[in-house]
Amino acid sequence: FGRTGAWFALDHWGVRPDLITFAKGVNSGYVPLGGVVISDEIAATFDHTPFPGGLTYSGHALATASAVAALRIMTEEKVVEHAAELGERTLGPGLRALLDRHEIVGDVRGIGCFWAVELVADRDSKEPLAPGKVEAVRAGCVEAGMWPLVAANRVHMVPPLVISHDDAADGVAILDRALAEVG
């Protein structure tokens, strides 16, 4: 919820799904909870044909109360708006600048607080950077105090939605230094 700077990533592109599933993010992972949101059209099918669901562990009061509280706090504290602002003012510009400074950065893509920096051996062919060098970038970040999510040849920047602009900028600077050390 809110990671891209909108409640759901699909909101950025005007997508109107028939069904959305969700889980731990709805209550910040405090208590296991998942759910489904359906369109009015899909919901209408149950007007005359009941859904044979509703098991003994459904509708758990503690889990749903924690979700209501988490969503209320996210709304009141404008967490989603903050994620959008972080992407627009700090993460996006900072990470995109890495393209100009490091030949091993082949692409930077993202929105809000959900970014990926693609590491390449060659920008033209997009040949992935060797795993050992990707690991060296990760290790450089960890040594400086940031634990990035690394998948294949991508360094993902997915900070907490409540991170400050200064701390987000520090994370970008740590990645910048780690990239410089590797090449």
Question: Model-predicted segments: where are they?
Answer:
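Conserved N-terminal phosphate-binding loop of PLP-dependent enzymes in the Aspartate aminotransferase
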Residues: F1-G183
